[in-house]
């Protein structure tokens, strides 16, 4: 079976622009939570916003100011550009592809169009909402980087980026491509904020994944991309190997997590097996850990079923960056690769009391200099779409 290597990383989130800024914030325990400033809203809940405005993002990308870009596309362009530059590849080759994901697409641009149209129907221009479709941001990234190979968009809610990474790996393993830029992007918008509020799972305080008092999630925005390559196409030393992956569709509920953790159990156990490992080989778990009562309970039960009493160190970065929906595993895959690269375990912020049922206690302090060989990273979406990835050191 062909090995899949990670050779490029790119990320933007509420804790930084670029890989180095994100890593510095994780090391310092610096979260990105604050009040909503991107748009007016009656909701008083913390979110993790990317600090740059749309115009600032356009300038960073040297884009024309007169053209309409959704914020989702701008965030994706910046992270994808960083990953592409890091990999040092010619992305115009037909053997290089792009698999990008998003949950809400260009909804933020559509909301701006709707507001101006309601104010004066002569102001609304239909060409301003061409970025509404989920595939629009992917097409913009492909055009910006000159990608001529396979270009595909995935949207499976919060597991989107994990599934994009898996599809990219499969295309390489089957010999269809030599390299693929994979990941996801999502921006904050009213649709997302009001939608999660209607589900009554937004915490009015900073989220507390796996804590007994957890009361919901905090939303965030950002983008994360990786470049995956086959061994024969390598031109630089890779960061690590994408050694395993799996997706399990339990279809328990449209928005809720299965109480017995069947979906997470299947995706985690199958990803570990796909990597040719046993549960005892996992050194760190980047859990999905949104901070909602049902998600953390479900994921906790699955972890107990797989690892029993030998639970490896685990943590959630959602209290740093919020839940970035379709971008979450793109961003967190970058963090997982950095964990292996530098021997790091990130803290779960705001954790104080262990859950009475699971008894699980995540890592609460930043740890470095550790022999991290295998990282399991989880990403679970609405509709029971559960995905897990395993990243491994080069000499395993």
PLM regions: where:
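ACP-dependent fatty acid/polyketide chain-elongation machinery
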Residues: 1-63, 232-241, 334-349, 392-396
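Acyl-CoA/ACP chain-elongation machinery
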Residues: 176-198, 203-214, 245-259, 287-296, ...
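Conserved small-residue
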Residues: 8, 26, 80, 98, ...
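Active-site-proximal alpha-helical scaffold in enzymes
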Residues: 76-88, 134, 142-145, 151-183, ...
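Active-site-proximal gating segment of KS-fold condensing enzymes and close homologs
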Residues: 102-152, 295-309
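Condensing-enzyme catalytic core mediating Claisen C-C bond formation in acyl metabolism
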Residues: 3-7, 27-36, 202, 206-275, ...
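Active-site pocket-shaping loop/turn-to-helix segments
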Residues: 14, 61-81, 125-133, 151-163, ...
């Amino acid at each position: 079976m062909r090995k899949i290597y990670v050779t490029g990383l790119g990320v933007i989130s509420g804790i930084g622009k670029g890989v180095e800024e994100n890593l510095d914030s994780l090391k310092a325990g610096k979260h990105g939570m604050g009040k909503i400033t991107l748009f007016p809203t009656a909701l008083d809940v913390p979110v993790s916003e990317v600090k740059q405005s749309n115009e600032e993002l356009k300038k960073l990308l040297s884009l024309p100011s007169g053209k309409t870009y959704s914020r989702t596309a701008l965030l994706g362009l910046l992270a994808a550009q960083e990953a592409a530059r890091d990999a040092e590849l010619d992305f115009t080759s037909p053997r290089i592809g792009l698999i990008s994901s998003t949950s809400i697409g260009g909804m933020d641009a559509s909301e701006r169009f709707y507001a101006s149209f309601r104010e004066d129907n002569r102001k609304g221009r239909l060409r301003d909402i061409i970025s509404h479709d989920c595939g629009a941001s992917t097409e913009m990234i492909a055009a910006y980087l000159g990608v001529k190979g396979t270009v595909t968009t995935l949207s499976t809610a919060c597991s989107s980026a994990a599934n994009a990474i898996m599809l990219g790996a499969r295309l390489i393993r089957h010999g269809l491509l030599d390299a693929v830029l994979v990941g996801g992007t999502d921006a904050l918008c009213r649709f997302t904020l009001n939608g999660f509020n209607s589900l009554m799972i937004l915490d009015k305080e900073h989220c507390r994944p796996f804590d007994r008092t957890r009361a919901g999630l905090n939303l965030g925005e950002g983008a994360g991309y990786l470049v995956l390559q086959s061994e024969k196409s390598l031109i630089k030393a890779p960061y690590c190997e994408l050694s395993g992956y799996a997706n399990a569709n339990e279809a328990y509920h449209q928005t809720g997590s299965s109480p017995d953790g069947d979906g997470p159990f299947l995706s985690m156990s199958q990803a570990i097996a796909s990597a040719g490992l046993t549960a005892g080989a996992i050194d760190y778990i980047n859990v999905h850990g949104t901070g909602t009562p049902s998600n953390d309970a479900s994921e906790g039960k699955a972890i107990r079923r797989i690892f029993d009493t030998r639970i490896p160190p685990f943590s959630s970065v959602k209290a740093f960056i919020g839940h970035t929906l379709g971008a979450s595993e793109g961003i967190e895959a970058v963090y997982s690769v950095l964990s292996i690269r530098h021997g790091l375990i990130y803290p779960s912020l705001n954790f104080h009391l262990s859950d009475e049922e699971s008894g699980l206690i995540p890592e609460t302090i930043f740890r470095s200099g550790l022999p991290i060989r295998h990282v399991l990273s989880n990403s679970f979406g609405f509709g029971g779409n559960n995905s897990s990835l395993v990243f491994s050191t080069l000499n395993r």
